[in-house]
């Protein structure tokens, strides 16, 4: 294992590197994780190991928050039982919002951790991304963008699915 410190910024070119960066950043989270994405499909928060990272983060302290802004909630509603269970178990700590129609053209993705670390996917259909560690100045504009999207978006209430 390489003991050298991680580069503060790293360009990412593959899906494998992207997934690795997601796991790295979720492991660093101490207060808040903010996500903006089309549908969470590429972030795969419902994958077993990644879901465990999200659960460990959110369960560690009642003040921790996960805020998610989505264009489309279909993946969360239909193919994310682990994430839906976390939302049920930790009400108020995990919040989802959906963008209004006029913002659905936005095609990037953001994963922002504690205002310090981030993963910026330049276009949701391409792996090309940038991972930023311990650089709040670099991420300030992205954080403001997330807050603007959050304010412009409507709260998303996931319906309860009853098994009959």
For each feature predicted by the language model, list its residue ranges.
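Acidic/glycine-enriched edge-of-secondary-structure segments
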Residues: 1-16, 31-44
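Charge-rich, low-complexity N-terminal segments
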Residues: 4, 24-25
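Terminal leader/tail segments of proteins
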Residues: 16, 56-57, 65-66, 147, ...
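Short beta->alpha connector loops
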Residues: 16-18, 101-102
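HKD (HxKxxxxD) catalytic microenvironment of the phospholipase D
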Residues: 33, 95-142
């Amino acid at each position: 294992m390489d003991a050298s410190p991680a580069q503060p910024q790293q360009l990412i070119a593959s899906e494998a590197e992207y997934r690795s960066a997601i796991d790295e950043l979720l492991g660093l989270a101490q207060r808040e994780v903010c996500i903006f994405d089309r549908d969470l499909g590429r972030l795969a928060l419902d994958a077993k190991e990644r879901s465990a990272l999200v659960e460990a983060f959110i369960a560690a302290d009642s003040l921790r928050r996960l805020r998610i802004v989505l264009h489309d909630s279909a993946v969360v509603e239909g193919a994310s039982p682990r994430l839906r269970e976390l939302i049920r178990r930790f009400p108020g700590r995990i919040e989802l919002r959906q963008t209004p129609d006029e913002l659905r053209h936005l095609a990037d993705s953001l994963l922002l951790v504690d205002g310090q670390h981030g993963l910026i996917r330049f276009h949701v259909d391409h792996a090309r991304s940038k991972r930023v560690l311990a650089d709040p100045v670099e991420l300030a504009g992205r954080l403001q963008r997330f807050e603007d999207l959050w304010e412009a978006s409507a709260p998303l209430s996931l319906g309860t699915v009853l098994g009959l």
